[in-house]
């Protein structure tokens, strides 16, 4: 799997420029004009992981296959979008399909780039985006809750349970709070996720700053960081211009460019890390002569379900997992050395896969 991240924001905040850079494509027509992105553009990137390169070298793998991250560039929101202003509800549904939402906020001053509300205020921009998503959630949830409540009153047990779940985000949305604030029990979570509420998604605030502020941020991004800390959201500081230049460079020129900009790594890496932390994702590996491959799972996933990410047959016929920790695999110079050192473990169906595990699944056909 990997994960799917929706990129949202007001028009002209650098959203499509950032999308182009992150996915190294020119799929989104980045122009100084609101609503130039009408259909969501979808781009995939390989998730950088130095461990995978090391494993491929040690395991003498012919091919390296990273896990994938999907970005969905969703058309520019404006105030009133939930009521059909701007592009309206046509694109809001695209956010329902993503795992996390990146709010791109304009944290730079440039008189040549218009702002849809003629001001530079990233917190106000975030409020506009969040409000429109909350209003869309409230409208859809009230319609569904009304129908479910009627069924619940007839004594339908399933309807009663579902209505109890619906009530929690409904009350919050009526108070102007996002659905992600709802306190759900583990038993309620599947039903809550199935509601696919826009504001139930974890949020990453992406502060698009001027080039000179890419390393340390600026006064605007500091405001966003304070809000994110209070909300438990993530923040990534990025200069879309720098990312755009970086994406067009030859591989051998990239390190020098980053050093010149005072950066240790590209913004993509920081955004991926923020997303993984928000969604509580971990990576395990499979290594062989043919390929070294990374697989993304949710923290806490057990071995059979982790195997199922490769193929459903692996999960159905799961017998055991031959498991070596990443450090032990490298220290042993591969599977044979790790096994000789007593570092290979045979794990059963209750084993919780750890980040960095190198695994070989045994299964019955």
What are these regions (language model features)?
Residues 1-114, 142-143, 148:
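Conserved G1/Walker A P-loop phosphate-binding module
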Residues 2-8, 13, 19, 142, ...:
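C-terminal-of-GTPase-core extension/linker across diverse P-loop GTPases
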Residues 3, 14-20, 48-60, 88-112, ...:
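Phosphate-binding glycine-rich loops and adjacent basic patches that engage nucleotide phosphates
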Residues 6, 35, 40-43, 50-52, ...:
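Short capping/connector residues at structural and topological boundaries
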Residues 22, 84-87, 116-119, 218-222, ...:
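Short, glycine/charged-enriched secondary-structure capping and boundary segments
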Residues 26-34, 41-43, 51-54, 83, ...:
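Glycine-rich, flexible loop/turn motifs
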Residues 43-48, 75-85, 96-157, 172-185, ...:
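Conserved Switch II/interswitch segment of TRAFAC-class P-loop GTPases
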């Amino acid at each position: 799997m990997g994960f799917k991240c929706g990129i949202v924001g007001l028009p002209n905040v650098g959203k499509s420029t950032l999308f182009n850079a992150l996915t190294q494509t020119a799929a989104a027509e980045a122009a100084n004009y609101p609503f130039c992105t009408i259909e969501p553009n979808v781009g995939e990137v390989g998730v950088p992981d130095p461990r995978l390169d090391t494993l491929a070298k040690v395991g003498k793998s012919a091919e390296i296959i990273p896990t994938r991250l999907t970005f969905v560039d969703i058309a520019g929101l404006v105030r009133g979008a939930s009521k059909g202003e701007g592009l309206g509800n046509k694109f809001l549904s695209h956010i329902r399909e993503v795992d996390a939402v990146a709010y791109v906020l304009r944290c730079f001053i440039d008189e040549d780039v218009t702002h849809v509300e003629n001001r530079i205020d990233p917190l106000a921009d975030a409020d506009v985006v969040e409000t429109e998503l909350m209003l869309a959630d409230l409208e859809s949830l009230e319609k569904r809750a009304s129908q479910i409540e009627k069924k619940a009153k007839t004594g339908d047990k399933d309807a009663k349970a579902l209505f109890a779940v619906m009530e929690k985000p409904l009350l919050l949305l009526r108070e102007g709070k996002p659905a992600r604030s709802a306190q759900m029990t583990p038993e309620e979570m599947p039903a809550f996720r199935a509601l696919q509420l826009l504001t139930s998604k974890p949020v990453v605030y992406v502060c698009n700053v001027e080039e000179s502020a890419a390393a340390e941020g600026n006064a605007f991004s500091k405001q966003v960081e304070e809000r994110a800390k209070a909300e438990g959201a993530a923040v990534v500081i990025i200069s879309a211009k720098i990312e755009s230049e970086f994406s067009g460079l030859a591989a051998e020129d990239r390190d020098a460019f980053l050093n010149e900009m005072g950066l240790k790594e590209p913004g993509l890496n920081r955004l991926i890390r923020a997303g993984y932390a928000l969604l509580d994702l971990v990576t395990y590996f499979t290594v062989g002569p043919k390929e070294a491959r990374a697989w993304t799972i949710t923290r806490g996933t057990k071995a059979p379900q982790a195997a199922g990410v490769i193929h459903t047959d692996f999960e159905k016929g799961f017998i055991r997992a031959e498991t070596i920790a990443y450090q032990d695999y490298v220290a042993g110079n591969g599977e044979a050395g790790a096994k000789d050192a007593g570092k290979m473990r045979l794990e059963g169906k209750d084993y919780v896969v750890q980040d960095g595990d190198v695994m070989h699944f045994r299964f019955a056909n």
